Amino acid sequence: MTWQFPDRLSTNSALPGPAFSGQPAVDLSSFADFLRRQAPELLPAALGGAQSGPASSSGGTGQLPHGTTIVALKYPGGVVLAGDRRSTQGNMIAGRDVKKVYITDDYTATGIAGTAAIAVEFARLYAVELEHYEKLEGVPLTFAGKVNRLAIMVRGNLAAAMQGLVALPLLAGYDIDARDPEGAGRIVSFDAAGGWNLEEEGYQSVGSGSIFAKSSMKKLYSQVVDADSAVRVAIEALYDAADDDSATGGPDLVRGIYPTAVTIGAEGALEVPESRIAELAREVIQSRSRADTFGPDAAGGDK
């Protein structure tokens, strides 16, 4: 589908803003650019909308809710993206059931870490951006195009990031144009300036507990043989991160709150059922309960 009236944007009286100034029409294939030119107040503040509240003042960012740890692993024929559920506000727990993993189109998903408000808007706006492009152009973006679109959005947040409002996504997807379907899983990490890196090791993590999660995945990655084993390793990595990072939440058996995960393969992006995640989480906890029993509480340790 293509825009039938190439000159309509700059003359349509129903579209307020710079259209009346005689400026050239915006790139219609980019929804974010369209909003930036026509209705910037609808954009997140960091991406060109009106600045308000803590985003416009330094020193007020410490009490904003922050998302924490996201992990991604490749498996033969796809990739898994998973995240914990905790958000923190300073030294307080702001939320225990926060959703941090979002399916953005048929073959990609993003995980969010950093300032929660900005990160969630990234995920939602990015999903609209991909859908908007496909509706106008009639074809989906290539995976490289999807990476570049997200990098532009991250770069647009640089000014806010320098004030402490950092939000970093982790992009996972399946490249339908890859020559080898078994190796078509893709993981892309970003820095605050919009630079990106295509992971070749097979796993990546972002967030406050990422160093612990990556160490765990490094040791367990040899166990990944399919989607189910990849989900288990992802849950185990989040468990390890929660064990050492207070900002990362592990499986909460009492409240019934577990990590969320998405698998992406040739069949598309699919959310892993909560029942399966709960089952794997219990298996991990049970195995760790046996393996980690040492010290004064170990068998034979009583005097």
From Swiss-Prot:
Which reaction equation describes what this protein catalyses? Cleavage of peptide bonds with very broad specificity
Cellular localization per UniProt: Cytoplasm
- Which EC class is this protein assigned? hydrolase
What's a single GO BP term from this record? proteasomal protein catabolic process
- Disulfide linkages recorded for this protein, renumbered to the chain, are none
The protein's UniProt keywords, in alphabetical order, are: Autocatalytic cleavage, Cytoplasm, Hydrolase, Protease, Proteasome, Threonine protease, Zymogen
Residue spans making up a coiled coil are: none
* Pathway assigned in UniProt: Protein degradation; proteasomal Pup-dependent pathway
- Propiece residues: 1-67
Q: Which domain of life is it from?
A: Bacteria
Q: How is its activity regulated?
A: The formation of the proteasomal ATPase ARC-20S proteasome complex, likely via the docking of the C-termini of ARC into the intersubunit pockets in the alpha-rings, may trigger opening of the gate for substrate entry. Interconversion between the open-gate and close-gate conformations leads to a dynamic regulation of the 20S proteasome proteolysis activity.
GO MF term set: threonine-type endopeptidase activity
- Active site location: 68 (nucleophile)
Gene Ontology CC entries for this record = cytoplasm; proteasome core complex, beta-subunit complex
* EC annotation from Swiss-Prot or TrEMBL: 3.4.25.1
* Subunit organization: The 20S proteasome core is composed of 14 alpha and 14 beta subunits that assemble into four stacked heptameric rings, resulting in a barrel-shaped structure. The two inner rings, each composed of seven catalytic beta subunits, are sandwiched by two outer rings, each composed of seven alpha subunits. The catalytic chamber with the active sites is on the inside of the barrel. Has a gated structure, the ends of the cylinder being occluded by the N-termini of the alpha-subunits. Is capped by the proteasome-associated ATPase, ARC.
Report the function annotation for this chain. Component of the proteasome core, a large protease complex with broad specificity involved in protein degradation.
> What family, per the record?
Belongs to the peptidase T1B family.
Q: What is this protein called?
A: Proteasome subunit beta
Query: What organism is the protein native to?
Result: Mycobacterium avium (strain 104)
Organism classification: Bacteria, Bacillati, Actinomycetota, Actinomycetes, Mycobacteriales
Supply the gene name.
prcB
